[in-house]
UniProtKB/Swiss-Prot annotation:
Function statement: May help in the organization of the PsaE and PsaF subunits.
Provenance organism: Gossypium hirsutum
GO CC annotations on file: chloroplast thylakoid membrane; photosystem I
Family classification: Belongs to the PsaJ family.
Cell location: Plastid, Chloroplast thylakoid membrane
Protein name as it appears in the record: Photosystem I reaction center subunit IX
């Protein structure tokens, strides 16, 4: 039961960090390449 509580307390923290970094990455891409439907570096 203790392992389940540890998992349930770690998963929200990791998902918050993951989605926060993903949102930051998308914001920075949109800052350098505004309104890009296709990215020019591909």
């Amino acid at each position: 039961m203790r392992d389940l509580k540890t998992y349930l307390s770690v998963a929200p923290v990791l998902s918050t960090l993951w989605f926060g970094s993903l949102a930051g990455l998308l914001i920075e891409i949109n800052r350098f390449f505004p309104d890009a439907l296709t990215f020019p570096f591909f």
